[in-house]
């Protein structure tokens, strides 16, 4: 179950961002984009996230996941389509097999809401560019 390692990585990244921001008293929610082709089971990730948050600044935080549908483009005819699950990577228009995956492999933190000890109001974590493996 690799969802636990994903959850631990998310908790580590959010905790690190909270430390850099300073005076963060609690994390309220974490929003993730999860591509339908990323190989992540949302229910298993939610369960793992709850366990990974225990005893940290994120304890009790809500995990919100947004599913990104898989999309592909045929190189020869430029047709784009939703690949579905299991993924259909043969072009439905021309039966071409030279396809490019456009979306569906995402696994990234989109937004974090936390409590700032000084302001007592939710703030957002700084955004970051996804690494190449996340695109």
Language-model features: locations:
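Short loop/turn motifs enriched for small/polar and acidic residues
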Residues: 30-37, 66-70, 110-112
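Short cysteine-rich clusters marking metal-coordination/redox-active sites
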Residues: 74-77, 91-94
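Short functional micro-motifs and their immediate structural scaffolds
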Residues: 82, 96-100
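Residues immediately within or flanking Cys/His clusters that coordinate Zn2+
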Residues: 71, 88
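Extended interfacial segments that mediate partner engagement and assembly in macromolecular machines
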Residues: 2-13, 40-42, 58-64, 87, ...
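Long, charged N-terminal interaction/targeting segments
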Residues: 1-61
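Short, intrinsically disordered, charge-biased short linear motifs at domain edges
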Residues: 59-65, 75-82
